[in-house]
Amino acid sequence: MTNLIRSNFQDHPFHLVSPSPWPLYTSVSLLNLATSAALSMHNFNNSYYLFFISLILVISSMAFWFRDIISEATLLGDHTLAVQKGLNLGVILFIVSEALFFLAIFWAFFHSSLTPTVELGSQWPPIGIEPINPFELPLLNTVILLSSGATVTYAHHSLIHGERKGALYGSIITILLAIIFTVFQGVEYNVSSFTISDGAFGTCFYFGTGFHGFHVIIGTIFLAVALWRIFAYHLTDNHHVGFEGGILYWHFVDVVWLFLYVSIYYWGS
């Protein structure tokens, strides 16, 4: 469907998208994934099989959800003004809910660090914990993630101005930086001297940075889908709601990492 014909179909306030089962399927799959992960940590029988099955269900639900959204937007022309507003509102509410989740993580961290108990040695970091140097790999990861925020903004502005090559190159560089960040995060976990079982410090550190790393992976998937859609001429200079949602999510990931770096890596060490 050409951009001119698609704009004629979408330039009205009616909601054309049919109810989708994928949000429910994805939510149930994520619940099973979290439950099976907790059971696996406590070595329940066959919990690892349930974990991998749940992971496959999450990935497949997301894939089918992406497929339907792309078909509705590009092939059917169902993403009218009302649908676009609903998608934007959904992204904003999703980010707000994630921000509240991270608020709980920071609350747990500052509660433990500002009032360390006797079991922690009445000090922070607790006795026996050697924190990670914030000016080594964490600082490099900070530069990498902030650079990815700049490159994705460049890709966005390039798409708005009709510069397809700039949008492609900016998106590719952003995804590469995201992959490098994820790899370095794994290296950091591998060389650290403490684990998630080492008291409140280890739990808050790995839960906060690990949950952020999970968001980086999700954001990378969003941007990879947007890159494919740019490559396939699905996105235009005035219609790229999915790309804008992925960019907004990526900037949220950047901001959360800054709070993690300053509080957990720098101040917490």
Curated annotation (Swiss-Prot):
EC number: 7.1.1.9
A GO term for molecular function: cytochrome-c oxidase activity
Residue intervals passing through the bilayer: 46-66, 90-110, 138-160, 167-187, 207-227, 247-267
Coiled coil: none
GO BP terms: mitochondrial electron transport, cytochrome c to oxygen
UniProt topology in membrane: Multi-pass membrane protein
Keywords, in A-Z order: Membrane, Mitochondrion, Mitochondrion inner membrane, Translocase, Transmembrane, Transmembrane helix
Catalysed conversion reaction: 4 Fe(II)-[cytochrome c] + O2 + 8 H(+)(in) = 4 Fe(III)-[cytochrome c] + 2 H2O + 4 H(+)(out)
Annotated Gene Ontology cellular component terms: mitochondrial inner membrane
Subcellular location: Mitochondrion inner membrane
Superkingdom classification of source: Eukaryota
InterPro entries: Cyt_c/ubiquinol_Oxase_su3, Cyt_c_oxase_su3_dom, Cyt_c_oxidase-like_su3, Cyt_c_oxidase_su3-like_sf, Cyt_c_oxidase_su3_a-hlx
Subunit text: Component of the cytochrome c oxidase (complex IV, CIV), a multisubunit enzyme composed of a catalytic core of 3 subunits and several supernumerary subunits. The complex exists as a monomer or a dimer and forms supercomplexes (SCs) in the inner mitochondrial membrane with ubiquinol-cytochrome c oxidoreductase (cytochrome b-c1 complex, complex III, CIII).
PANTHER family, A to Z: CYTOCHROME C OXIDASE SUBUNIT 3, CYTOCHROME C OXIDASE SUBUNIT III
The family this protein is said to belong to: Belongs to the cytochrome c oxidase subunit 3 family.
Annotated function: Component of the cytochrome c oxidase, the last enzyme in the mitochondrial electron transport chain which drives oxidative phosphorylation. The respiratory chain contains 3 multisubunit complexes succinate dehydrogenase (complex II, CII), ubiquinol-cytochrome c oxidoreductase (cytochrome b-c1 complex, complex III, CIII) and cytochrome c oxidase (complex IV, CIV), that cooperate to transfer electrons derived from NADH and succinate to molecular oxygen, creating an electrochemical gradient over the inner membrane that drives transmembrane transport and the ATP synthase.
Protein name: Cytochrome c oxidase subunit 3
Species of the source: Podospora anserina (strain S / ATCC MYA-4624 / DSM 980 / FGSC 10383) (Pleurage anserina)
Lineage: Eukaryota, Fungi, Dikarya, Ascomycota, Pezizomycotina
